[in-house]
């Protein structure tokens, strides 16, 4: 079968000009003009696709097959070029029959040339072939234009779908030119309108929670930096966690003398039932001399202190990817679930703007993984946002999955973020030791985003930084009143 590309070579037709005309017509379409005006940051991203459009149009010409009638006529023309004038005169009846059989536009003109010139000279032979070629060029050009026009319509339809998707998500995910380009690349997928509306929904929720967006900005843009010492150092405020033992009972740690009725030893409680010892019991109660269980725990609170500023002139280090672990237990349902998903969406926005990767892991009874900044990032984000938080809490599996991920070479400078209410069991010692090794040896940073004020201090103290976003009703009302 003869392809359109081969036909153009035979007839010496330049396909480059045809392709360029189609590209210009595509860029001049009213739909794109309106889109560029409404979303200027996406204009540059879209124009980066122009080389791909050219290649797609050229590929269409290379792969398309010409109609059988046109192919037969071209083959007849090629054979006629090889004939001498005397041979050509002998073949004229067959050539005329061929032109009529394939329905060539040149058939009538050829018949007139034959009828008007009973004696064919070499000049008429050349004229006949020139006009035949001209007719073939017109047919080939028309066929090329038809093919390219169909491809233009298909391209325009594809671009319109991507424009609709990118336009809807621009406000949610685009922060600068880089993120606009990455969003445009990710829009090259098969998504329906109802799918990406879920991202718009959580984007609207995030807009209603500016404190959550601010928290994501602080976490996402925080990074240790090299600095230069300065002699005259002013004081600066810094926050640190201080330990307050015995304020949060977690485990039995011996005996003590006190007046705590709820933690009395059974022998002490027995004296209360003996008449002769009842007054002795009350005396020891007043003097806080009753034997009781001592329950010891590790409570930590944030303390604000002053220290001299010893470093200035920061040289910020490059930021690495995010590995975000999200608790999907039942206690994280409802408003907590909305906040956790919106927070991850905010981190995705930051990752797109800073050309970073954002890897999400959901942990409950099993670990589910999503990468939000790959080529199929939008589809992955939709799947993540569609999840329901109804599982259990297995924080240890979460840390094991993070540690395994950080072993990969491409994640050597990643930041780990755990989003949870941290109402869970104690972490095994081997998990705690592994996290400390990653922090000490490999300089990985672990962030906690605490969605509750009741998280276990024993779990949270392994993190480098704790970002608090209390989702309790009181905190929600306070934030609303502050706006």
UniProtKB/Swiss-Prot annotation:
The keyword Cytoplasm applies. One of its GO terms (cellular component) is cytosol. The keyword Cytoplasm applies. CDD domains: VWA_YIEM_type (cd01462). InterPro entries: Uncharacterised_CoxE, Uncharacterised_ViaA, VWF_A, vWFA_dom_sf. Keywords: Chaperone, Cytoplasm. Disulfide bonds: none annotated. Pfam families: VWA_CoxE. It comes from the Bacteria. Signal peptide: none annotated. It is found in: Cytoplasm. Belongs to the ViaA family. Homodimer. Interacts with RavA. Component of the RavA-ViaA chaperone complex, which may act on the membrane to optimize the function of some of the respiratory chains. ViaA stimulates the ATPase activity of RavA. This is Regulatory protein ViaA. It comes from Cronobacter sakazakii (strain ATCC BAA-894). The lineage of its organism: Bacteria, Pseudomonadati, Pseudomonadota, Gammaproteobacteria, Enterobacterales.
């Amino acid at each position: 079968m003869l392809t359109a590309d081969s036909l153009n070579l035979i007839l010496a037709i330049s396909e480059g000009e045809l392709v360029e005309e189609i590209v210009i017509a595509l860029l001049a379409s009213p739909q794109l003009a309106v889109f560029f005006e409404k979303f200027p940051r996406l204009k540059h991203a879209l124009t980066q696709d122009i080389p791909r459009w050219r290649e797609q149009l050229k590929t269409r010409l290379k792969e398309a097959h010409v109609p059988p009638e046109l192919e037969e006529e071209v083959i007849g023309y090629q054979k006629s070029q090889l004939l001498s004038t005397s041979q050509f005169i002998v073949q004229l009846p067959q050539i005329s029959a061929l032109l009529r059989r394939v329905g060539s536009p040149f058939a009538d003109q050829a018949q007139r040339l034959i009828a008007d010139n009973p004696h064919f000279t070499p000049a008429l032979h050349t004229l006949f072939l020139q006009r035949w070629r001209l007719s073939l060029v017109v047919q080939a050009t028309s066929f090329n234009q038809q093919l390219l026009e169909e491809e233009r319509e298909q391209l325009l339809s594809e671009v319109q779908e991507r424009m609709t998707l990118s336009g809807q998500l621009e406000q949610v995910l685009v922060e600068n030119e880089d993120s606009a380009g990455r969003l445009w690349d990710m829009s090259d997928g098969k998504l329906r309108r109802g799918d990406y509306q879920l991202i718009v929904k959580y984007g609207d929720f995030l807009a209603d929670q500016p404190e959550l967006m601010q928290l994501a900005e602080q976490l996402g843009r925080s990074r240790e930096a090299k600095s230069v010492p300065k002699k005259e150092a002013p004081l600066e405020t810094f926050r640190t966690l201080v330990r307050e033992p015995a304020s949060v009972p977690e485990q039995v740690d011996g005996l003590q003398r006190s007046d705590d009725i709820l933690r009395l030893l059974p022998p002490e409680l027995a004296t209360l039932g003996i008449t002769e010892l009842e007054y002795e019991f009350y005396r020891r109660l007043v003097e806080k001399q009753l034997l009781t269980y001592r329950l010891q725990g590790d409570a930590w609170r944030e303390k604000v202190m002053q220290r001299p500023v010893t470093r200035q002139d920061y040289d910020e280090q490059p930021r690495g990817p995010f590995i975000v672990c999200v608790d999907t237990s039942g206690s994280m349902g409802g408003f907590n679930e909305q906040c956790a998903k919106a927070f991850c969406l905010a981190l995705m926005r930051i990752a797109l703007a800073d050309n970073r990767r954002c890897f999400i892991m959901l942990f409950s009874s099993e670990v589910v993984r999503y990468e939000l900044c790959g080529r199929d990032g939008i589809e992955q984000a939709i799947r993540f946002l569609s999840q329901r938080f109804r599982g259990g809490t297995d924080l240890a599996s979460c840390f094991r999955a993070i540690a395994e991920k950080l072993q990969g070479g491409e994640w050597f400078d990643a930041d780990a973020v755990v989003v949870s209410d941290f109402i869970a069991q104690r972490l095994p010692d081997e998990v705690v030791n592994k996290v400390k090794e990653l922090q000490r040896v490999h300089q990985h940073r672990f962030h906690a985003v605490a969605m509750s004020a009741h998280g276990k201090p024993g779990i949270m103290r392994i993190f480098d930084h704790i970002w608090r976003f209390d989702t309790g009703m009181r905190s929600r009302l306070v934030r609303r009143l502050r706006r």
